[in-house]
Each structure stands twice: as C-alpha cells, then as structure tokens.
Amino acid sequence: MKEDRQDLTTGSIWGKMLFFSIPLVLTNFLQVLFNMADIAGIGQFAGSLSLGAVGSTTTLVTLFTGFLIGMGGGTNVLVARFFGAKDKESTIKTIHTALLVSMAAGMIVLIFGLLFSKGILELLNTKEELLDGAVLYIRIYFLGMPAMALYNFGNAVCSAFGDTKKPLYYLGAAGIVNIVLNLFFVIVCKMDVAGVAAASIISQYLSAFLILRALVKVGGDYALRLSKLRFDKRMAGYLIQIGLPAGLQNGIFQVANLFIQAGVNTFDAIMVAGNSAAANADALLYDSMAAFYTACGSFMGQNYGAGKRKRVRNSYLVSLAYSFGIGTIGGIALVIFGRQFLGLFTNDPAVVDAGMKRLTIMGFSYGFSAFMDSAIAASRALGKSVIPTVIVIIGSCIFRMVWVNTVFAYFKTIPSLYLLYIFSWGITAVVEIIYWVHVYRNTKIG
C-alpha cells in the first residue's frame, strides 16, 4: 500500500478529492447493490415469510452497523491528522490502538445482539409469524459484527492514508462471494433465512481478512504488527471521543426514523408500499454523498496535521460543493426518471404513483442535507464530535419526532410528513455551520 498512499496536503483539492472519492462512491454503491441482491434473492427463492423476517431486522441491523461505521470515523480522523503531521510514532500508536478498540466494539455488539435481539424485535412489534425467522437471522448475522468492525477499521486507515481503491476491490470480491453463497445456500441447500445470514458473515470475514492482510503487508513503519499491539489510553480516549458520538448519532437516527415510519403506516397499504420502494433512493444518494464526508475527514485531517490552515478550510468547502452537487443532480434525476426507478421494485401503477409523491419532495431536498453533514464531518475532522452530535440529535432527531406529532398530526398528508426532512436539515445545518466556524476560528492550526 506504500505506493497507494497520497499526500493530501499539496496539489489541487478539487482534482484530488474527486479521484479520492470516486472509489468511495463505488464502494458505497456496491454495498447498496449487494444488499438489494440479498433481499431480491430471498424474496425470489425463499418466499414472502422469509423475506418479511429478514426485512423486519433492517432497523436493528442498520442501528448497529451505523454504530460501528461511526466508530471507524474516529480512526480515520486521527490517523489522517498524525500522518499529515509526519508524526510516525503517534500514527503507529493510533493504528494499533484503533485495532484493539475496533475488536472490542465488534465483540460488544456481538454479545449484545445475541442476548437482546429477540427482546428488541418484540419491542419493534415484529409480527409473530416472522419473529422466529428474524431472531435466527439476526443471531447468525451478528456473528459477523467483529469482522465488520475490523473491516471498518481497515477502511478508515486506508482512507486516512489516501488509499480508497483497496477497500473497493475487497468489498467487490466479498460482495460477489456473498451473492454466490446466497444462491447456493438458499437454492441448493434450502437453508432459507439461515443461508442468507451465513453468506453475509462469510463475506464479512473475507473482506476483513483481505483488508487486514493489506495492512500487514504495507511497506515501511506503518505495517500492522502483533509486536506493536499496545493499548494506548490517550489514543483510545481520542478515538472514543470522536468515534463514539458519531456511532451513537447513527443509532439515534434509526429511532427517529421509527416515528416517521409510524406516520407512513397511518396510510393505506399502497402508500406504505410506495414509500418502501421510493426509500431505496435514499441509500443510493446518501451513500454517494457520504463518500465526500469521508474525504472531508481525510483531507482536513492530513492538512490539520500539516498545519495548513487555508487547505483545512478549503477541504471543507470543496467537499460541501461536491456532496451538494451530487445530491441536487441525483435528486432531480430521480424526479425526472422516478417512474422508471420505481418500476425496478414494483409493477403496480398505484404503488408507483404513491412512490412518486415521496420522490418528488425528497428529490428536491437531498442536496440540502449536504450543508448539515459536511459541517458535522468538518467539525469532527478538527477533533470536535460531541457538540455536533448533540446538535444533530436535537435538530434532526427530536425535531422530527415533534414534527410527526404536531405538523403531521394536524395536516395528516404525505407532503406534511416528507417536508420534515428539508426543514430539519435546514435548521440543523445553520447551527452546525455556525459551530464549525467557531471551532475553525478557535483551533490552532500550524
């Protein structure tokens, strides 16, 4: 990986960030496609009950995977900062401490899932006929959480070094294995829900193995070495200070989304189905935009470490421009070609019409989320994670719950529900940007 490391402290930010982010966009896009393939496979070959069982675990799975991804963000920020500062000792300490922290986080999530998944699924009102299959799926799936934590660790380190290609290659290989094993376990072995979960964890351990192998083989002083595995309390504190709030934020968003889903569920089955189909656009656009938030952390981290104040600011502005552009252009494209997009998930014209109500509002809203998320990423890149998390919890989570129980409860229309997104993004963005400007002005850089 030595030849793949990039110095993000020199050259054109526009060009470097674009080429840095393209593999990240493709990585996130592949992940969405593989998840869709999982759902399609079990729906086609295992029946509606199995599909419902797997689908009923989505919120729980997203909550914990989001937590692990957020924890990886702390690794990305710190490694990039020390690497940019040419501080080898701190970089090495951070990498090896982050590996131990990631392993611990993965094991904690695994144990929690095995012990409490059934109770949580019951609290989420999982239908009785789906509960046994859902519990079986989630308990097998959670066996892969340590691997997911390790892959996110490796991905964060690679991104901090400016290498976004290897994670793409490894995820692509693991995703193909996942699809093949899915079909084999479900069609040939008749393993149903257990087969889908088993395929997922095998592919997760494969991707973790590949990325850890790359870090072991890296040239120079930054290679992973068992002899260097030490738990540095100071570095662990920094990692948790940045990563834990981000992980908790991802989880709390899922709680807020439950209130939104409850609002959708007050409409008829056609509208619920249309919402589900249209919601597939969220992952495509959010994950594409998220690539530039990761880039923001890596670019700002390296330049922060290098003491280049102006490039720190410009890295934030460029990532904001790119993410806003993708969200806006992609959203408008979904409005124009929305019926064709929804046709990938349903042949029912009524469901397509219902889905277009969501897509039309969301299509013109996606881009505005960039102002909120870019500011959050920028604050975390400067080591400030707690306050941005508190702001987003109040502005985008609690605000949404209040909106559902006031504005939506009064009007009881689909537009009055979906408009909460752009209003919550706008309000939160204003506060997040003000906070970032304050942090930037008061942070000693260089």
Show the residue positions of the predicted features:
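Transmembrane helix-bundle signature of multi-pass secondary active exporters and lipid flippases
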Residues: 24-77, 141-148, 237-302, 323-330, ...
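Hydrophobic transmembrane alpha-helices of multi-pass small-molecule transporters
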Residues: 63-66, 178-182, 208-212, 284-287, ...
